[in-house]
A protein has these predicted regions:
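Short, charged low-complexity linear segments at domain edges
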Residues: 1, 27-47, 305-313, 347
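Short, intrinsically disordered, charge-biased short linear motifs at domain edges
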Residues: 1-6, 42-53, 187-189, 316-319
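Iron-sulfur cluster-binding cysteine motifs and their immediate structural context
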Residues: 3, 8-10, 14-39, 50, ...
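N-proximal short alpha-helices
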Residues: 35, 48-49, 185, 327
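A ubiquitous short alpha-helical element
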Residues: 43-47, 61, 93-97
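Iron-sulfur cluster-binding electron-transfer modules in prokaryotic oxidoreductases
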Residues: 72-396
């Protein structure tokens, strides 16, 4: 299904210039050599696969920069899935199986959160699993978003206009409040929120950690649920995570060969959906929110080209002073920055962004990506929130 267009590469190396990983990691050959150049060799002999492709962080900034529309990131991810014979480690299993880890951790969240914050536990994880002890581990919620949603499902069904919410792992296991904030905002626009009948992790962590077959199975399952919402019920699907949105729309057909034809155009980021409704005449009774905020553009948001919608939505909040940070990778790249061997590179990639944030004088940082939030809050002194949360606060 995927046409990576690797033969269209004109060898200009602008992709390497845009690559945050090759800038700080001399062990990574860069997207041109790892992507279209390497693909020509791999097609002749798969034994020419370069293990250094594991250093690609799949940010897609190479694809944004490419003047020939070569899908460089897709080439690299597909090559890793096809040629890499390395058996995934226990560490990579734990980092990538977010539904499993979330389902076993949320019932014991207070204990899990306390334990993973202890220095001896983090040192043990570093020694035994190579999860870097310097990395702050995400906190789990005591109870999932889906469980909470049952208490409001009947109320949500009363609204004439409906959307389906792909909540993702972050909202379900780590931060249900974001899902509650979204419901509050959509209800203020006379729109009810449904959940998909069955939802699994979007699959991005699985792809990144060598579990491509598992990611494909989950994608097929998710597409069935998406089709039920879009084609059967006739309602759009929205997500608060820029990476989940990107995966559902683009990674499924381009990397996993899972057909989402007829669905893709009905899947969008929550901020984009909200802005389109406001632009069409809907209103939100927003109160002043006197905050100085800076917005960080996630890499996959940059790839989709949807930053404008979030920015215009934030500008609707009275009293909000908004500054857009330079578009650059924060460095965490999902599970990449949790790994001991990648931690120094992860922090080096993000260092310019961290400096800009600290020098901004902002009250908080705003972004549409949950892992960017984790990285920014760990690496700076600033709190980081989702734009939907600010809208919910402005509603009072």
């Amino acid at each position: 299904m995927s046409d990576t267009r690797f033969e269209s590469c004109i060898k200009c190396t602008v992709c390497t210039t845009a690559c945050p990983a090759s800038r700080v990691n001399p062990g990574y050959p860069g997207p041109k050599q790892a992507g279209p150049d390497g693909e020509r060799l791999r097609l002749k002999d798969g034994a020419l696969y370069d293990e250094a492709l594991k250093y690609c962080i799949n940010c897609k900034r190479c694809e944004v920069a490419c003047p020939s529309d070569v899908k460089i990131g897709d080439i690299i991810q597909r090559a890793r899935a096809k040629y890499d014979t390395t058996r995934p480690s226990l560490r990579n299993f734990i980092l990538s199986h977010t539904d499993l880890m979330g389902s076993v951790s949320t019932p014991f969240a207070p204990v899990v959160n306390t334990a993973t914050a202890l220095k001896p536990v983090r040192q043990l994880l570093d020694y035994a699993l190579k999860i870097d002890h310097r990395r702050t581990l995400p906190k789990y919620s005591f109870g999932t978003f889906r469980r909470w949603y049952r208490s409001v499902a009947a109320q949500q069904a009363k609204y004439k206009d409906q959307v389906a919410f792909f909540h993702g792992c972050f909202v379900n296991y780590n931060h249900p409040q974001l899902g509650k904030d979204l419901i509050k905002v959509l209800n203020a626009m006379d729109t009810g929120v449904q959940l998909l009948s069955k939802e699994k992790c979007c699959g991005v962590p699985l792809i990144a950690n060598g579990f491509t077959d598992k990611a494909r199975k989950q994608a097929i399952s998710n597409v069935e649920s998406l089709r039920e919402a879009i084609a059967v019920k006739g309602i759009p699907v929205i997500a608060t995570s820029s990476t989940c949105t990107f995966a559902l729309r683009d990674e499924y057909p381009e990397v996993l060969d899972v057909d989402n034809a007829g669905l893709r155009e009905h899947i969008e980021l929550a901020t984009r959906w909200l802005w389109r409704k406001l632009d069409a005449g809907k209103t939100l009774p927003l109160n002043p929110l006197p905050l100085k905020v800076v917005y960080h553009t996630p890499c996959h948001m940059e790839k989709m080209g949807w930053t404008l919608y979030t920015l215009e939505l934030l500008r609707q909040i009275p009293g909000l002073e908004l500054t857009v940070l330079d578009s650059q990778c924060c460095g965490i790249a999902g599970t990449y920055g949790f790994k001991k061997e990648n931690y120094p590179t992860s922090q080096s990639i993000g260092a310019p962004l961290f400096r800009q944030i600290e020098e901004s004088g902002a009250d908080i940082v705003v972004t549409d990506c949950e892992t960017c939030k984790w990285q920014i809050e760990m690496s700076t002194s600033k709190r980081c929130e989702h734009p939907i949360t600010l809208l919910a606060q402005a509603l009072g």
